[in-house]
Regions:
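A composition-biased, non-transmembrane "mature-region" signal
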Residues: 1-294
Length: 294
């Protein structure tokens, strides 16, 4: 079978977004270094404050050893100041992502997010990870294509490499990086060290209705549109030579395909075909509004 997957993160990033990616990596590197120092500083602060508090709450030592008590107080304050300074540095190291959009584009993006919110509630969503063409005669089937699929989740969320105020549509990926749909770009995220940024103009998201021969339980939000058999004749009738031949429901699913000129290739099956179609229509409306600049 042939894998259905995107190219590596080194290849996917759009030409015009390489500098933005570099800044994100730089900011993340600085944050990681500060986080390491901050953990050490927080531990030192806890120890210093606990020691000072024991002396302060006691009666004898702070009166008998006044100089030592003063030193403990100063040490506790110093560790608190160091921790606060590192937290400030951590905040400043974050690269805030603010994308200015015309009112029409912003409204279209919000409508697309609403459509995605409905899509994510589909009973089942699968990532198509492998495919092959069927030999319809040898396999005695009416299906043109055989796929391997794995269940994934869609949700609205945030990715740790992007500092933004909004939640972006998030598409899980069973054999590659997760996808986040932001107003100005698509983020393909494997890890904080491996991610790509794709310009919206280079990505195409399409919808196709798929008649799927479902051998598992039929999702509650799907429509059964036909019936077939495990083994069939050329005319679609059941092949009576097979004693244990059984009936298979043909279910209407929505197929989402994401392609880019830089090598993105992702494909999903959604049990709620109507929600999938409405999402892609809302996405197309957003792209049109974003390109018009109105």
């Amino acid at each position: 079978m042939q894998e259905v997957a995107s190219a590596s993160t080194h290849e996917l990033t759009s030409q015009g977004l390489h500098e933005f990616k570099r800044l994100l990596i730089q900011a993340r590197t600085e944050q990681s270094a500060i986080e390491t120092e901050l953990i050490t500083a927080q531990k030192a602060e806890r120890q210093a404050v606990q020691t000072y508090d024991r002396w302060r709450n006691g009666w004898l030592f702070k009166r008998v050893r006044k100089q030592r008590f003063q030193q403990l107080q100063e040490a506790a304050q110093l560790t608190t100041d160091v921790r606060a300074e590192l937290e400030e540095q951590q905040s400043q190291a974050r690269l805030s992502t603010q994308i200015e959009m015309p009112d029409a584009a912003r409204s279209a993006f919000l409508r697309m997010s609403d459509a995605f919110a409905a899509l994510k509630n589909a009973s089942r969503i699968w990532d198509t990870v492998q495919e092959r063409s069927t030999n319809r005669v040898a396999e005695r089937t009416m299906a043109h294509r055989t796929v391997m699929r794995k269940p994934v989740r869609f949700d609205l969320g945030r990715c740790e490499v992007i500092e933004a105020d909004w939640q972006a549509p998030h598409l899980g990926n069973a054999n590659g990086g997760d996808l986040y749909l932001y107003p100005g770009f698509i983020l393909y995220f494997v890890s904080t060290d491996a991610f790509s940024l794709l310009d919206l103009s280079e990505v195409e998201i399409t919808y196709d209705p798929v008649r799927f021969h479902e051998t598992e339980a039929v999702p509650t939000d799907s429509k059964t549109v036909d019936r077939t058999w495990a083994k069939v004749n050329k005319d679609g009738s059941p092949d009576r030579r097979f004693k244990d031949n059984y009936e298979i429901p043909v279910v209407l699913y929505g197929q989402l395909s994401l392609r880019s000129t830089t090598g993105m290739r992702e494909e999903y099956l959604v049990s709620n075909a109507e929600a999938a179609e409405e999402f892609v229509a809302a996405w197309a409306a957003f792209i049109k509004a974003a390109r018009s600049g109105e």
